[in-house]
Amino acid sequence: MKENEKVIMEKGIHTDFKENMTYGEYLQLDSLLSSQKRLSDHHDEMLFIVIHQASELWMKLILHELNAAIESIKQDKLQPAFKMLARVSKIQSQIIQSWDILATLTPSEYIEFRDSLGQASGFQSYQYRMIEYALGYKTPHALKIYEKDQELHARLHTALHAPSLYDVAIQALVKEGFSIHKDVLNRDITQPYEEDATVEAAWLEVYADVKKYWNLYQLAEKLIDIEDWLQQWRFRHMKTVERIIGHKMGTGGSSGVSYLKRVLDQRFFPELWNVRTKL
């Protein structure tokens, strides 16, 4: 072997791990990398599994950041929350790119293993449901999907009854002296949020005097970023599904593309979009 072809090993690099934790042990890679179990013999099922598992890992981090941001805003610590919410947006942009990879799966390939999924569907993703709850889109009827696992059902029940990111953002408006209608402040937070004129008026004032309400303005823009990315994710989801299965019914029983098109119209922070027209 020529001198320049030899493997270079720096003297300080650790090679003896008999009594020390390794990279693989820290990340529990044996468990993580043994979780991709195909139910068919089709080569492309591995792609399908990995894409969805990777997305679930990213969603775990999104929930970690969203929940921390909600607690931070509750405690009037908006600056730390901005960093967490900005990170959520970056994660969302990463997840969106995964649709490009899944789109390499053709209809002919997917149909070879689709029956192996049974009634399993991304619609049942409990982490995605918890993200929706954290953002304020509450759907109590969806809890029935998770009754098979009582511990999981209890976690979702707790998430349903917890204040959302928008709930604490509205409370931040109140703390700044804005007058918000009592029906908003005393509403049933287990139900989807409905837009309100007093909330819109408050945000309009924030946007009209950015210097005075800089922190609230920054918070509002972070929320818009998150909803914008989420809508882009939904659109890419819808188009990828249409590309692979057309207008067939989803494995979970939904109408598939038709359902995904309808959810594109769901808004999390309606007043923040409305003020853009009224400024």
UniProtKB/Swiss-Prot annotation:
Record-linked InterPro entries: Trp/Indoleamine_2_3_dOase-like (IPR037217), Trp_2-3-dOase_bac (IPR017485), Trp_2_3_dOase (IPR004981)
GO MF annotation: an example: metal ion binding
List of residues binding heme: 237
E.C. code: 1.13.11.11
UniProt keyword annotation of Translocase present: no
Keywords of this entry: Dioxygenase, Heme, Iron, Metal-binding, Oxidoreductase, Tryptophan catabolism
Cofactor(s), names only, from the UniProt record: heme
Catalytic function, reaction form: L-tryptophan + O2 = N-formyl-L-kynurenine
Keyword Oxidoreductase among UniProt keywords: yes
Entry's cofactor comment: Binds 1 heme group per subunit.
GO BP, sorted A to Z: L-tryptophan catabolic process to acetyl-CoA; L-tryptophan catabolic process to kynurenine
Pathway(s) where this gene product acts: Amino-acid degradation; L-tryptophan degradation via kynurenine pathway; L-kynurenine from L-tryptophan: step 1/2
List of residues binding substrate: 48-52, 110, 114, 251
SUPFAM superfamilies for this protein: Indolic compounds 2,3-dioxygenase-like
Oligomeric form and interacting partners: Homotetramer.
Protein family (similarity comment): Belongs to the tryptophan 2,3-dioxygenase family.
Role of this protein: Heme-dependent dioxygenase that catalyzes the oxidative cleavage of the L-tryptophan (L-Trp) pyrrole ring and converts L-tryptophan to N-formyl-L-kynurenine. Catalyzes the oxidative cleavage of the indole moiety.
Name of protein: Tryptophan 2,3-dioxygenase
Organism: Bacillus thuringiensis subsp. konkukian (strain 97-27)
